[in-house]
Curated annotation (Swiss-Prot):
Gene3D superfamilies: 2.30.30.30. Keywords: Ribonucleoprotein, Ribosomal protein, RNA-binding, rRNA-binding. Belongs to the universal ribosomal protein uL24 family. The keyword RNA-binding applies. NCBIfam families: rplX_bact (TIGR01079). This is Large ribosomal subunit protein uL24. The keyword Phosphoprotein does not apply. GO terms for biological process: translation. The gene is rplX. One of its GO terms (molecular function) is rRNA binding. It comes from Ectopseudomonas mendocina (strain ymp) (Pseudomonas mendocina). SUPFAM superfamilies: Translation proteins SH3-like domain. Pfam families: KOW, ribosomal_L24.
Length: 104
């Protein structure tokens, strides 16, 4: 079970975007995350009239490593760590500071 999943709100704790918050758009297999509005890079794209793609410089989100982010606890307004608990035979994610379920 992953500690950070899609649609979790995270805060960047290291790197050029330190302190910024965003929502996880995609989780990649090698412990990398794509987060909305964070780690933006410029990509030069060729025009492709067949698929209707206009050429130019496009800004898009690049993946960043999971070790550079922490899950954001909206109750405490701080970065938090994730632990696991078994309730009713199911494994659930909980915030370490409050012991409340993540996303509830």
């Amino acid at each position: 079970m992953q500690k950070i999943r899609r649609d979790d709100e995270i805060i960047v704790i290291a790197g050029k975007d330190k302190g910024k918050r965003g929502k996880v758009l995609k989780v990649l297999a090698d412990d990398r995350l794509v987060v909305g509005g964070i780690n933006l890079v410029k990509r030069h794209t060729k025009p492709n009239p067949m698929s209707g793609v206009q050429g130019g410089i496009v800004e898009k989100e690049a993946p960043l490593h999971a070790s550079n982010v922490a899950i954001f606890n909206s109750e405490t307004n701080k970065a938090d760590r994730v632990g696991f608990k078994i309730e009713d035979g199911k494994k659930i994610r909980v915030f370490k500071s409050t012991q409340k379920p993540v996303g509830a």
